[in-house]
């Protein structure tokens, strides 16, 4: 019903012996962050908004590098879902994916983009969270596939370059021994 009750219930030990409590899960940390944020004080008044915020806090952090960025994603999603429209707009989704639709870069940058696309894929797959849900599900899937193919190429190239370098060094040493 209220933030205090929700946090208390999250802190309880599981009733089943074979389950164990994991302290400070990512979604719980996110919820505590937003409950302390002055911009989100109004959620305490409406139970639906608190449930919605909790659901948004459960968006997985696939990137796992920058907490601020993940909290920004959660905050943006929550603001759209709690607005009068109640859904993330096509324009917002388009802007998020345009930033990620780049096939250049090294293994780390490609992996990071894939992780970010997975976040938006998760959001797209949540029922009634985005306008034109089927379109965005397909769009995120295609973008993730393209980035994954490019990552595979980059990994293969890196592996082959290292292997060729090792072989070349080995051949050079063999030639030095023979002369």
Predicted stretch roles:
Residues 1-45, 51:
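C-terminal or mid-to-C-terminal helical accessory/interaction module adjacent to the motor/catalytic core
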Residues 36, 42-179:
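Extended, charged helical/alpha-beta scaffold domains that provide interaction surfaces
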């Amino acid at each position: 019903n209220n933030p205090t009750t929700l946090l208390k219930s999250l802190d309880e030990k599981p009733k089943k012996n074979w389950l164990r409590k994991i302290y400070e899960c990512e979604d719980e940390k996110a919820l505590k962050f937003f409950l302390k944020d002055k911009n989100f004080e109004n959620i305490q008044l409406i139970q639906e908004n608190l449930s919605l915020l909790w659901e948004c806090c459960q968006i997985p952090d696939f990137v796992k590098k920058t907490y601020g960025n993940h909290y920004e994603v959660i905050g943006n999603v929550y603001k759209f879902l709690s607005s009068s429209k109640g859904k993330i707009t096509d324009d917002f989704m388009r802007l998020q994916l345009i930033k990620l639709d780049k096939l250049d870069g090294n293994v780390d940058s490609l992996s990071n983009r894939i992780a970010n696309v997975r976040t938006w894929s998760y959001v797209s797959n949540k029922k009634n969270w985005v306008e034109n849900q089927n379109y965005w599900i397909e769009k995120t899937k295609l973008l993730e596939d393209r980035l994954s193919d490019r990552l595979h190429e980059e990994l293969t190239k890196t592996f082959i370059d290292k292997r060729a370098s090792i072989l070349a060094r080995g051949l050079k040493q063999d030639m030095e021994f023979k002369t």
